[in-house]
Swiss-Prot record:
Keywords attached to this entry: DNA damage, DNA repair, Endonuclease, Hydrolase, Manganese, Metal-binding, Mitochondrion, Nuclease, Transit peptide, Zinc
Region Disordered, residue ranges: 232-296
Protein name, as recorded: Apurinic-apyrimidinic endonuclease 1
Places the protein is found: Mitochondrion
Organism: Plasmodium falciparum (isolate 3D7)
The record's free-text note on cofactor binding: Binds 2 Zn(2+) and 1 Mn(2+) ions.
PROSITE patterns named in the record: AP_NUCLEASE_F2_1, AP_NUCLEASE_F2_2, AP_NUCLEASE_F2_3, AP_NUCLEASE_F2_4
GO biological process: base-excision repair
Length: 597
């Protein structure tokens, strides 16, 4: 009896010690595998499509990725478990009530809770890019990554997501799914990614949450697009940043409000840009492109030339000289321009490469090839030039650029050169600014031979010189060689400076005023622009013909008036077509105005 009792007690005791040491050993193993503080309370959200499309989610959505934190076996088990259960639609505890979810939530519990062993491998699931995001404290999950997780590796994956997945990565995932389809005899078409878009040969119809039907392909594409653009539903939870990375929830209210305001401003700007782009698309809808066929371009050019012979009005545009000044005549021919303006060098730099002999030779050849009269070529001066500046050092710098431009005109045998008189920069009177401009013109006349300097009237900006006809007159009066000075009237600038040119009668009165003050013999060119701003605004805002504050009578007057015959009339309107075809369209319509009664 005693032996039996002893045997029983010993057996129980040994069983107890065996269990105890086994449990202790097991715990030690666990502690080795899962370091201290490895678990934390929270929820990890992974974006999927719907119950009906679970079979496609892993490969199609491409936002579920696994980051190996140091334990390959657990990592692989985790991945396999997830893949198998997901594909077979046999989802256990964390996936209950899946019928109504667009998101599946993986539960991760604290290590000191009873259910600490519940799906430990989900610790290895990370949504790419989620580590960069954090919400308020309620939504913050997995607030720190332990030493066992290599933050650098995670960062690398995050950057992959941020930069968008490589095409090879997408195709690899597609192949993985296709392999799964074959192995499991799933009755479905294979899939692949192309240019970031999910492609499927058959567009299945599935029932959506509202009871309607939706195209599977479109549903998947929508989700892929949302993920690539980092846009998620409000119920999506985000992983917070690892230790050492700033948590948004800890930011001050001021910073949060500031960021919200900035975001709203960006949204407004995006909306404005969208409206502008839509408006631009509507504006350009009826504008024909420049013909690709050279013969067609010659036919269009010859028509315009006939109109010019009848009207004695020579229209053109400020065109691109990209690739060299020799390309300007070609570009002008393409838009059927009989006159043109160009920059002889970079208009926003003080120094530019000199013209080569080849540039000069080809420019001459192209002018002859396309029958350009050099009296109708009007180069535009650099925007940096300010001859009215009272600061001698700065004015001398402007003068050297001014002189360089005019010498380039002489190299190309061009007769006219147009520039803005400049600004007093608020440091001298307008009269002093006028004298500075005239002194520079007199000086450049002595250093060059025959180029006519053409003063462009300004729009009336603060401290500007040249917005009033009297300014132009006073500069001319101070210039010694009157044969080498002239004026270019810009219609937008004239209107913005306060001269009413909206009707035939008003424009005619303005031109009589110009003749009385300046003398019409000095009118050497016109810049033809509509105006975005109203009369007297002082704003230099060019607009396409018929789209601004001026009227078609303004432009009809230009076409018919005696004041604008046999001088270059240059369009400087916005190139809304981005290929200069707008200028051809405007030139053709302007000649039509001449023939209207």
């Amino acid at each position: 009896m005693f032996f039996s009792f002893y045997h029983s007690s010993f057996s129980s005791l040994s069983s107890f010690f065996f269990s105890f040491f086994s449990l202790l050993l097991y715990m030690l193993v666990l502690l080795q595998i899962f370091p201290k503080n490895y678990y934390e309370a929270g929820t990890l959200s992974i974006r999927v499509i719907r119950k009906n499309t679970f079979n496609h989610s892993y490969n199609n959505i491409k936002n579920i990725h696994y980051i190996h934190c140091g334990y390959p076996n657990i990592f692989n088990n985790c991945r396999n478990y997830y893949m198998n259960n997901f594909y077979n639609n046999n989802l256990s505890a964390p996936f209950k009530n899946k019928n109504n979810y667009m998101h599946i939530f993986f539960k991760i519990v604290e290590g000191n809770k009873k259910k600490k062993r519940e799906h430990p491998f989900f610790k290895y699931l990370f949504h790419m890019n989620m580590l960069e995001k954090s919400g308020d404290k309620k939504n913050t999950v997995i607030s720190k990554i332990t030493e066992s997780c290599q933050y650098g590796d995670i960062r690398k994956y995050m950057n992959m997501k941020k930069e968008s997945l490589e095409e090879g990565e997408k195709n690899k995932s597609g192949e993985e799914y296709n392999k799964h389809v074959e192995q499991n005899n799933i009755k479905d078409e294979k899939i692949h990614f192309k240019d970031g878009t999910f492609i499927k040969s058959k567009e299945e119809e599935i029932e959506n949450e509202k009871g309607g039907t939706i195209c599977l392909k479109k549903e998947i594409q929508k989700n892929v697009l949302e993920i690539n653009n980092n846009t998620y539903n409000n119920d999506t939870k985000y992983l917070s940043n690892p230790k050492g990375v700033t948590n948004k929830s800890k930011q001050s209210k001021k910073e949060i409000e500031k960021k919200k305001k900035k975001k709203n401003n960006n949204n407004n700007n995006n909306n404005n840009n969208k409206i502008k782009s839509e408006k631009s698309a509507n504006d350009t809808k009826n504008i024909p492109p420049i013909p690709k066929n050279t013969e067609d371009r010659w036919n269009d050019y010859n028509k315009i030339k006939e109109y010019a012979k009848i009207s004695n009005v020579y229209l053109g545009a400020h065109i691109s000289a990209s690739g060299g000044v020799q390309n300007a005549p070609i570009n002008s021919f393409n838009i059927s321009g009989l006159a043109f303006a160009l920059f002889l060098k970079n208009q926003r730099k003080w120094e530019s490469a000199a013209l080569t002999n080849e540039n000069i030779k080809q420019f001459e050849e192209n002018c002859k090839k396309y029958n350009f009269d050099k009296n109708f070529i009007l180069p535009h001066g650099s925007y940096l030039i300010n001859l009215a500046n009272p600061d001698k050092e700065k004015r001398d710098k402007s003068y050297l650029s001014f002189l360089d431009d005019i010498k380039r005109c002489e190299q190309l045998n061009i007769k006219l050169y147009n520039f803005h008189p400049g600004s007093t920069v608020g440091q001298c009177t307008v009269d002093e600014g006028i004298k500075n401009v005239a002194d520079c013109i007199n000086k450049v006349h002595k250093e060059t031979n025959n180029v006519i300097i053409v003063l462009e009237n300004s729009a009336g900006q603060k401290n500007s010189v040249g917005s009033k006809f009297e300014h132009l007159r006073d500069i001319i009066n101070l210039v010694h060689d009157k044969d080498r000075i002239g004026v270019c009237l810009d219609t937008c600038h004239t209107f913005a400076a306060g001269y009413n040119i909206k009707t035939f009668e008003n424009f005619d009165n303005v031109m009589k005023q110009f003749d009385d003050i300046v003398n019409v013999k000095y009118l050497k060119a016109v810049h033809l622009n509509d105006s975005k701003s109203d009369i007297g605004s002082g704003l230099d805002r060019h607009e396409n013909i018929g789209k601004g504050k001026l009227t078609m009578d303004t432009f009809k007057y230009i076409m018919k008036s005696k004041y604008f015959k046999n001088i270059p009339i240059i369009l400087e309107t916005p190139d809304i077509t981005n290929d200069e075809s707008i200028y051809k369209y405007e030139i053709q319509n302007l000649y039509k105005l001449y023939f209207e009664k």
